[in-house]
From Swiss-Prot:
It comes from Thioalkalivibrio sulfidiphilus (strain HL-EbGR7). The lineage of its organism: Bacteria, Pseudomonadati, Pseudomonadota, Gammaproteobacteria, Chromatiales. Produces ATP from ADP in the presence of a proton gradient across the membrane. GO terms for cellular component: plasma membrane; proton-transporting ATP synthase complex. Keywords: ATP synthesis, Cell inner membrane, Cell membrane, CF(1), Hydrogen ion transport, Ion transport, Membrane, Transport. NCBIfam families: ATP_synt_epsi, PRK00571.1-4. GO terms for molecular function: ATP binding; proton-transporting ATP synthase activity, rotational mechanism. This is ATP synthase epsilon chain. It is a peripheral membrane protein. It holds the Pfam family ATP-synt_DE_N.
Length: 141
């Protein structure tokens, strides 16, 4: 039997996943990180993207989109504190495209009270959602 550890993925709205895993892969600011059992203590800021939780040797895996957050790793527990989190199967492509359109429009139509950083962050998040939707589409064919 493979070694496992406990994983919690939570957002302000709800707990998305709580259970055991063999591996977690998350989009840290410095690059994608893979966490295995007995990993040394680690904390990282997360960027928008996919968190993958490998549950078993059979290949069962959960994919969760996060808009950013924090990753805390202890030897036997991994916690993802996400700004927002959505199960991959629940992502809405039309909503993501609309969010991207609005962010691109805001970036091109700057006004005096324009918040460039916010518009850029919204664009990055929308693009990450669309990449994840496209990845899911390729894997379900």
């Amino acid at each position: 039997m493979a070694m496992t550890f406990h994983v919690d993925i939570v957002s302000a709205e709800e707990s998305i996943y709580s259970g055991t895993a063999q591996m977690v892969v998350a989009p840290a600011e410095g690059g994608e990180v893979g966490i295995l059992p007995r990993h040394s203590q680690y904390i990282a800021q997360l960027k928008p993207g996919e968190v993958r939780v490998k549950v078993s040797d059979s290949g069962e895996e959960h994919s969760i989109f996060i808009s950013g957050g924090l990753l805390e790793v202890q030897p036997h527990v991994v916690t993802v504190l996400a700004d927002t989190a959505v199960r991959a199967k629940d992502l809405d492509e039309a909503e993501a495209k609309e969010a991207m359109r609005r962010a691109e429009e805001a970036l091109s139509d700057r006004k005096a009270d324009f918040d460039y950083a916010k518009a850029q962050a919204e664009l990055i998040e929308a693009a990450a959602r669309l990449r994840m939707i496209e990845k899911l589409r390729r894997h379900t064919r």
